[in-house]
Amino acid sequence: MHTTRIAIVGAGLAGLYAAYLLEQRGITDYVVLEARERVGGRIASLVPDEARASEGVDLGPSWFWPGFQFALGALVESLGLSSFAQHETGDMVVERSHQMPPVRMQGFANQPSSMRLQGGMQALIDALRLRVEFSRLHTG
């Protein structure tokens, strides 16, 4: 029987980040246990055309705010990921219920700015996944 000192339950952002931090500190006696067949947890991006993988559509979280999420902003930068400001000018369309028609409303700007990752938030998961030893990750 194989024994391990550290078990990380879940391969979402928190689980992969925990494994990444262990790797950064030279700690290798760990496993990551994920019930699903894929990593990422609530973060998932759909890439409709593989030829344009940089244009993923986020199905979970879409934005981050490095202006107050300092650790996440630093992680994105340290992983060499490209980010861009969320488009905020013009009107927006809001659908409050499937029983009511969508309504056009004046847009607004976030302070601090909302940022997105090139390729969707899945790019963050993919970058962390590449830095975690494959043999330590066990998916369902």
Regions found by a protein language model. Give the residues of each.
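FAD-dinucleotide binding site
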Residues: M1-G140
